[in-house]
Amino acid sequence: MAKKKKQNNPNSIAQNKKARFDYFIEETFEAGLALEGWEVKSLRQGKVQINESYILLKNNEAWLFGALITPLITASTHSNHDPLRLRKLLMHRREIDRLMGLVDQKGFTVVPLGLHWSKGKVKISIGLAKGKKLHDKRATQKERDWNRDKQRIMKYHA
């Protein structure tokens, strides 16, 4: 029998590691999600992918697009479950207005960073981000490799 993958944070549901590789994260925000019952059950089972998702700011509202929440097999069959439906983010008006201003003026974008539980509610961490160029990605990878090598050297020579 295969062992379950151990999570670092028990409150964490899903992480978008690709976002931190593709973007410089300038600032992070936390928002609630408007979910249906079957989606919460699926999240408890960890059946979610946010790697291909993005956030759209439209009509003074924030929406999560492309997040795949797979319905459970035991979910109700008499209702239609759309795994890719758009989900509304629950944020304060001033936060949304600030994000909209920065996205319009300075070329920022808003990306989902992760899903987690907070007091029994699902929260999404979103980041105000600026895209990385190819040479920036290479520099990040080089720095990550050097830190890994440094740790190995310290482990064996200390």
Swiss-Prot record:
Its main location: cytoplasm. It is found in: Cytoplasm. Signal peptide: none annotated. One of its GO terms (biological process) is trans-translation. Keywords: Cytoplasm, RNA-binding. PROSITE patterns: SSRP. InterPro entries: SmpB (IPR023620), SsrA-bd_prot (IPR000037), SsrA-bd_prot_CS (IPR020081). Required for rescue of stalled ribosomes mediated by trans-translation. Binds to transfer-messenger RNA (tmRNA), required for stable association of tmRNA with ribosomes. tmRNA and SmpB together mimic tRNA shape, replacing the anticodon stem-loop with SmpB. tmRNA is encoded by the ssrA gene; the 2 termini fold to resemble tRNA(Ala) and it encodes a 'tag peptide', a short internal open reading frame. During trans-translation Ala-aminoacylated tmRNA acts like a tRNA, entering the A-site of stalled ribosomes, displacing the stalled mRNA. This is SsrA-binding protein.
